[in-house]
Amino acid sequence: MNKIKKFLNKFYLDRNEKEFIRHNKKIFIPKPNRSKPLVLMELNESSANLISYSYMASILEKKYDATIFSFIPNVPRSFFKKSMWELRRIFGYKTLRIFKSFGTDRLIIPSLSGPMKIEVNDIFQKKISFIKTKDDLENLTIFGILFGDLIYDYYLNYYKEPEIDLSSKKFRQHLRFCIGLIVFWNSYIKNNDVKAISVSHTVYSNAIPSRIANNYDLPSYQTTVEDIFLLTKDRLFAFTEFKDFRSVFQNLPANIKRQGISKAKE
């Protein structure tokens, strides 16, 4: 009964959500046009981030004169899960309704075409033979892009296991699944006029679209309730501003440097 209630709650807006949608419709007046370039926004259910998502989407839409598409990063792992996402799209999943209120025009649910499945199998057969150690996995590249760290961490997170057995059937299935995501997003970003992308995380499978966007020199962002991070080929992760501290410190006035060093010694 609780599971049914939880599922139904995904379709019904509470008072605050309704108010937020009214606010968005007053503030944001998008003009979707599918002949325009695209900005992709990951459909994320984190309530705390939705306000920043709405303003970020509006800024990117205006900057690139683009249409906003939302997306889920993963290919649904079963027919049932894919059906659930289709039902959410058709009957008004509440998070999707919130996204539509600030301008998203379509929800992308990844799926693999016949040629994509052949490509996935070819890549899998080539890569699996080279993965002998966990370091091999962590350093795995596909299309010249580093994905091994994402595949590794996503396995541990998804299966809630402390380590990977590289010889297991479960790992082989997981690797094939992740290659499917990579093939889909590489094809989508390569063959559509995508101008920018916003993701919820820079780890796990969520980061696959951003890594591919970076490879095509497209701006990608992690948008949170407090921060927005620009991701690049050289800066794959959010929260890495500490790497700039030395250069920032060197550009400070001498008296500020002295005060800071003195304070640090206390």
Mark where each language-model region is.
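A short, glycine/small-residue-rich beta-strand->loop->alpha-helix junction that serves as a flexible
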Residues: E42-Y53
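Conserved N-terminal ligand/cofactor-binding loop architecture of enzyme catalytic domains
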Residues: M1-E42, I59, K63-I179, V225-E266
